[in-house]
């Protein structure tokens, strides 16, 4: 029984950030926030959410190892990707309005909180943003995005073997997925499932004739081939900047935006790769408002979703030009315990807590007390 169980405000106000789950913690890297100074080049920020205490913390800036020597830290960016392999977060791609896009690989040690730039070889992908990254074993797969130098959408797949730090451009077989950015790619078994994103009627080049594909495309990492997929009778609307995650061998997507429909979404869909069918899911409880560019991480049987941007309530759900960046966080529980359901009842009906054990009162307080590290709200335009 899926249920939205937690809604807290006051976390990092972020759009187009990237995040990974490490145990019971979620690490969030960078992103954009309306009203912040992005002309001045600065270090990427790192926020950590503790899924037990339900509290956010922010890591302090990295100090130079020696006087006059700049620390090895990625610059602040958005549209980048992060993946976790062992105890290392690999951050790649993204862009900044001052420096443009980047193709330097950064490694972040979750134990020491230190950054490094591993020496890589092979065919390094061109600098881009809006790509996807997913992991199979010790290999990271990069697909799509918008390449800065070529000034076009990509449908290439690159892989990085992190045991040898070697990049490879995969010569794929079969009918490739269309060029796109801000899609999702989710690894289920040895297959990469690509959904959504923004494409263009004129192929790789951007002409403002946008296409929002709602067909699942599947890439087999063993044969390095795009598979021919059967038609699906029920489909979500095509969208970009949504969230996707795998749970119990199935694919889920949430939210996103379709410019042709001028619509933001807050629907949740489940895709079964065996029957190749979609099903719309209606969780219990109050979920997030329609949004795009949020982050979503799985922690055990829970989904932690935070940030993103939505139309201003005064403008309705479809206005592209007045957006509000979010500092909220929502938790979707796939298997809420009886204890969790009881705590929700105490909160919903404002029941007396004085007779409850101290640890239960502490948990109730954590579930209802907002964080306080977000910037003041600012509208964005465009």
Swiss-Prot record:
Record pathway: Protein modification; protein ubiquitination
GO cellular component: Cul2-RING ubiquitin ligase complex; cytoplasm
Keywords from the UniProt entry: Cytoplasm, Kelch repeat, Meiosis, Repeat, Ubl conjugation pathway
InterPro entries in alphabetical order: Kelch-typ_b-propeller, KLHDC3-like
Subcellular location: Cytoplasm
Disulfide links within the chain: none
A biological process from GO: protein ubiquitination
Kelch repeats: 25-77, 88-138, 139-189, 191-249, 251-301
GO function terms (MF aspect): chromatin binding; ubiquitin-like ligase-substrate adaptor activity
Gene3D superfamilies according to UniProt: Kelch-type beta propeller (2.120.10.80)
Summary of the function given for this chain in its UniProt record: Substrate-recognition component of a Cul2-RING (CRL2) E3 ubiquitin-protein ligase complex of the DesCEND (destruction via C-end degrons) pathway, which recognizes a C-degron located at the extreme C terminus of target proteins, leading to their ubiquitination and degradation. The C-degron recognized by the DesCEND pathway is usually a motif of less than ten residues and can be present in full-length proteins, truncated proteins or proteolytically cleaved forms.
PANTHER family: KELCH DOMAIN-CONTAINING PROTEIN 3 (PTHR46461:SF1)
Subunit structure: Component of a CRL2(KLHDC3) complex, also named ECS(KLHDC3) complex, composed of CUL2, Elongin BC (ELOB and ELOC), RBX1 and substrate-specific adapter KLHDC3. May form oligomers as a KLHDC3-ELOB-ELOC complex; this interaction is likely autoinhibitory for the E3 ligase complex.
Name of the featured protein: Kelch domain-containing protein 3
Originating species: Bos taurus
Underlying gene: KLHDC3
